[in-house]
Amino acid sequence: MTNIRKTHPLLKIINDSLVDLPVPSSVSSWWNFGSLLAACLAVQILTGLFLAMHYTSDTATAFNSVTHICRDVNYGWILRYLHANGASMFFICLYIHVGRGLYYGSYMYSETWNIGIILLFAVMATAFMGYVLPWGQMSFWGATVITNLLSAIPYIGTDLVQWIWGGFSVDKATLTRFFAFHFLLPFIIAALVVVHLLFLHETGSSNPTGIPSDPDMVPFHPYHTIKDILGILTMLTVLSMLVLFSPDLLGDPDNYIPANPLNTPPHIKPEWYFLFAYAILRSIPNKLGGVLALVLSILILAIIPMLHTSKQRTMMFRPLSQCLFWLLAADLLTLTWIGGQPVEHPYIIIGQAASVLYFTIILLLMPLVSTMENHLLKW
């Protein structure tokens, strides 16, 4: 008798995606981050749902409602900090996931890669809007500064900003619509994740060697289910330690001050996971140029498949490209550090140098070094 999981219309889909799915036997723990991201999304949707039951999106009561959640709601404090620090874990996993894609040439599956870029933008938009909701000082001024960047768009910029604000400044209308979008977007992200997986399962997963792995596959269950569960438990342990021992480690103290439109904080900065892009934005003196650099710093991922000049798919056997990859990782960490510093000497020049290096590595050095490695293969 055939097993029901192989015949039932609904169970068959789950079976083909999570049980009998053939996976290359050589995939390493770097392939775990997809499942970790799914776990992060589940944690964020669940905690967010319970937080939304108590939160009020009104400028007069938003800050107090968050305080009420932490003080009066049963386990409200843990929900709030799981949600806030869950976002940090989400971005750590997200950046490692993208980095793994760059290192092992996963971008050659263009549909999966492009959906992934859309997902990255959607998660960034969701996180930005979520940061505005507690209505602290950094929430308010972060929202004001970042939305104001759209005014750099010629002709329609000012109208666009006022349209997003729902008035002439960040106010009640802005907060209400940001809450609505922040609630809606995670479900759109979940739908995009399904599409992401759909395209991935069309081609099958890549592997560290970059060579076709059809002759050497293992079933997803039990090998990779066990591996994923271990990864998820590790991530949840780290998240729990962060939430229970130092919940405000990654936050901004200014956000414990209620939003005041009449008092600007000395250093306006976004959450740590946007600091690299913020540093690139600040490194260009021109407003429109800065906004373009900011968008291109993420959108540049879309042209990476076109910049692939190597005869090998992955960097596993390409030591020169590996050096460049880790230089890029170090450069991004430098940009993250600079983004959190005040705009003064020597941080300005370091930020500008790191920004130039970021684009130079991706657009110029990586394709050149890949071509050079192709010639070295002939020796």
Swiss-Prot record:
Gene Ontology CC annotations of this record: mitochondrial inner membrane; respiratory chain complex III
One matching Pfam family: Cytochrome_B
Gene3D superfamilies: Cytochrome Bc1 Complex, Chain C
Ranges in coiled-coil conformation: none
Keywords: Electron transport, Heme, Iron, Membrane, Metal-binding, Mitochondrion, Mitochondrion inner membrane, Respiratory chain, Transmembrane, Transmembrane helix, Transport, Ubiquinone
Main location: mitochondrion
Matching InterPro entries: Cyt_b/b6_C (IPR005798), Cyt_b/b6_C_sf (IPR036150), Cyt_b/b6_N (IPR005797), Cytb/b6-like_sf (IPR027387), Cytochrome_b (IPR030689), Cytochrome_b_C_euk/bac (IPR048260), Cytochrome_b_N_euk/bac (IPR048259), Di-haem_cyt_TM (IPR016174)
Binding site for heme b b566: H97, H196
Binding residues for heme b b562: H83, H182
CDD domains the record matches: cytochrome_b_C, Cytochrome_b_N
Domain of life: Eukaryota
One MF annotation (Gene Ontology) recorded for this entry: ubiquinol-cytochrome-c reductase activity
Binding residues annotated for a ubiquinone, in chain numbering: H201
Bilayer topology term: Multi-pass membrane protein
Cofactor(s) needed: heme b
Localization (cell): Mitochondrion inner membrane
Other comments on record: Heme 1 (or BL or b562) is low-potential and absorbs at about 562 nm, and heme 2 (or BH or b566) is high-potential and absorbs at about 566 nm.
Quaternary structure annotation from Swiss-Prot or TrEMBL: The cytochrome bc1 complex contains 11 subunits: 3 respiratory subunits (MT-CYB, CYC1 and UQCRFS1), 2 core proteins (UQCRC1 and UQCRC2) and 6 low-molecular weight proteins (UQCRH/QCR6, UQCRB/QCR7, UQCRQ/QCR8, UQCR10/QCR9, UQCR11/QCR10 and a cleavage product of UQCRFS1). This cytochrome bc1 complex then forms a dimer.
Name the record gives this protein: Cytochrome b
